[in-house]
């Protein structure tokens, strides 16, 4: 069955992170939905660098849908919108409750996950400028970190977005699929990957 991926976007979303996640997931053959968390319901918005982003639908329209992964791009403005979106926070909470894989990069781990205490004991990374939001016991200074005990993958910023995306593919479908995606992109997965916890 085709994996379903949700990538929320909002005004101020980091464009490189969002587009890299979306593009890489499509290359893997996954069904990708981009959903706007904008408070005014608009589907078209400006990202953190002023680039226009367009969502497939409003987040509320897919709030009850099932996704294999929710992947949260960063960008301070976008992450703040995510933080303040009741719909998104509840979707993440339910996603975690169901034991599904969640990804968050850049500012999103700190401004969304930590702010709402969604993964209080999980090991994670984020953009280094937000390290102070994460408890020392939970902080991992790696470009990509997977806490398998919490099914949570986090990453640091625009420069790590491709590694993050490839590692999401590995977590979903294994390394063979990831290499099928990575090779024509002329990239090498798992260079800076750090997995914590024990697989059950």
Describe every region a protein language model picked out.
Residues 3-13, 24, 28-37, 56-58, ...:
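Active-site-adjacent pocket-lining segments in enzyme domains
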Residues 35-57:
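N-terminal beta-loop-helix "entrance" segment that forms/cooperates
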């Amino acid at each position: 069955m085709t994996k379903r991926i949700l990538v929320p976007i909002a005004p101020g979303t980091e464009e490189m992170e969002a587009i890299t996640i979306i593009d890489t997931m499509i290359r893997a053959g996954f069904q990708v939905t981009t959903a706007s968390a904008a408070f005014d319901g608009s589907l078209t918005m400006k990202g953190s660098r002023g680039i226009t982003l367009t969502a497939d639908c409003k987040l509320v329209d897919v709030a009850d849908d099932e996704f294999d992964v929710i992947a949260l791009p960063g960008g301070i403005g976008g992450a703040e919108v995510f933080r303040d979106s009741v719909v998104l926070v509840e979707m993440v909470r339910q996603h975690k409750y169901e034991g599904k894989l969640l990804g968050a990069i850049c500012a999103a781990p700190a401004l969304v996950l930590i702010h709402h205490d969604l993964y209080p004991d999980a090991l994670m990374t984020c953009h280094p400028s937000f390290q102070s939001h994460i408890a020392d016991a939970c902080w991992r200074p790696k470009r990509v970190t997977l806490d398998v005990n919490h099914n949570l993958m986090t990453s640091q910023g625009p420069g790590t977005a491709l590694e993050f995306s490839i590692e999401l593919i590995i977590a979903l479908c294994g390394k063979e699929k990831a290499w099928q995606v990575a090779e024509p992109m002329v990239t090498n997965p798992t260079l800076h990957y750090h997995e914590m916890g024990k697989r059950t």
